Curated annotation (Swiss-Prot):
GO terms for biological process: cytochrome complex assembly. It comes from Rhodopseudomonas palustris (strain BisB5). Its EC number is 7.6.2.5. It is a peripheral membrane protein. Gene3D superfamilies: P-loop containing nucleotide triphosphate hydrolases. Residues 3-200 form the ABC transporter domain. SUPFAM superfamilies: P-loop containing nucleoside triphosphate hydrolases. It catalyses: heme b(in) + ATP + H2O = heme b(out) + ADP + phosphate + H(+). GO terms for cellular component: plasma membrane. PROSITE patterns: ABC_TRANSPORTER_1, ABC_TRANSPORTER_2, CCMA. Keywords: ATP-binding, Cell inner membrane, Cell membrane, Cytochrome c-type biogenesis, Membrane, Nucleotide-binding, Translocase, Transport. This is Cytochrome c biogenesis ATP-binding export protein CcmA. GO terms for molecular function: ABC-type heme transporter activity; ATP binding; ATP hydrolysis activity.
């Protein structure tokens, strides 16, 4: 499995974010996007996820046709946790599993993996910032997709939460998955760096 981008150009709000950008990443590999604020790290993740259309260039998954959608093979974890405050931890994950079209999976196992078993029936509105981030991370586990696109994934996590997420990422890579992450902090896993934009 591999994912590549060629000649990518991104324009947002009439401003060119980047042009001529390319990348390649293979299954079992983590790619860390680094660069100053506004360099285009989040924009690249959103292009790959299909949330933005490139002004030029192509993104290809697994050697297929350039127009093959990557979105159906990828999870995108953005800055916002995208939770429904009135729904419980379990209900939020059930919603996302149905929305993403996943096969039935073990929701309690996903909740346990992120350390929220004690809060499984608690509404998301009552969770701390770190707990909300862990619940958001649990979405990666309820529907199996080979590509994880992560935007500052460890924000709001304490040291213990970062270590637990590092183990989840390591397991994903060991199973042949691929991770592309925009981050200002160490991911806690071995990752190849790709700098976007001029050095800060």
């Amino acid at each position: 499995m591999w994912l590549s981008g060629r000649g990518l150009r991104c324009v947002r709000g009439g401003r060119e974010v980047f042009d001529g950008l390319g990348f390649e990443a293979a299954g079992g590999e983590a790619l860390a996007l680094v660069g100053h604020n506004g360099a285009g790290k989040t924009s690249l993740l959103r292009l790959i996820a299909g949330l933005l259309a490139p002004a030029a260039g192509t993104i290809t998954f697994d050697g297929g046709e350039p127009d093959t959608p990557v979105a159906e093979q990828a999870h995108y974890l953005g800055h916002r946790d995208a939770l429904k405050p009135s729904l419980s931890v379990t209900e939020n994950l059930a919603f996302w599993r149905e929305f993403l079209g996943g096969e039935p999976t073990d929701l309690p196992a996903a909740i346990e993996a992120v350390g929220l078993a004690h809060a499984a029936e608690l509404p998301a509105a009552y969770l701390s910032a770190g707990q909300r981030r862990r619940l958001s991370i649990a979405r990666l586990l309820v529907v199996r997709r080979p590509i994880w696109l992560l935007d500052e994934p460890t924000s709001a996590l304490d040291v213990r939460g970062q270590e637990a997420f590092g183990r989840l990422m390591s397991d994903h890579l060991a199973g042949g998955g691929l991770i592309i992450a925009a981050t200002h902090s160490p991911l806690g896993i071995a990752a190849r760096e790709m700098r976007i934009g001029a050095a800060a």
